[in-house]
Amino acid sequence: MRKLSFLDRVIEELDSYARFTKAPLNPSKKSPSSDTIDGKLSEVEKKHSAGLMRVDYTGEICAQGLYRGQASVAKSPQTKEHLYHAAAEEYDHLAWCGERLQELGARPSLLNPFWYWASFGIGAVAGSISDGLSYGFVVETEKQVMKHLDSHLKSLPMNDNRSREILKQMYIDESEHAVEAEKAGGKKLPKTVKAIMKLQSKVMTTLAYRF
């Protein structure tokens, strides 16, 4: 099998980015909201739900970038496979959030290209240091995503049943991903790194909700 050159890998990543940012996405599992009926939402409630789901969509864009960036420089084939598998599972979440945004008459964040490639760069730097650090980033990322999901579940309008079902399933999946990464040897990140990640997350959620 021919070893991919740097240019080959760049083209491969550009192709992957184009595929999962193109609507409609095709998840491997149907949306958890498929059999759920919404209550009546006011325009204000619909706008708020759309803002929350836009944040969650962008969070999944960041996860794709981080995991693919880590996988691109992973030290071992096992780590590379683990990360690409995690990215594939997160793709379903991306598709579910994208579908829900369309139902709410909203669009994804205009800043998603920036967040994807910024996350890809962070992932590549972490992955180039060690696989243990790479898994540590996965653990911390999933924990932060779970906090967002928990707050969004509490903030969703009472009648937004479809969004709620999606976020509940995402929370379960993210929890499993964090446990798997810890078992794979994820190292505990320094407090400074965690603080920077939280700050980046705060900026992302604030901007994605509005734009």
Swiss-Prot record:
Principal place of residence: membrane
Membrane topology, record value: Peripheral membrane protein
Residues bound to Fe cation 1: 60, 90, 93, 174
UniProt binding sites for Fe cation 2: 90, 142, 174, 177
EC number(s) from the headed UniProt entry: 1.14.99.60
GO cellular component: plasma membrane
Protein name per its UniProtKB record: 3-demethoxyubiquinol 3-hydroxylase
Originating organism: Francisella tularensis subsp. novicida (strain U112)
Gene: coq7
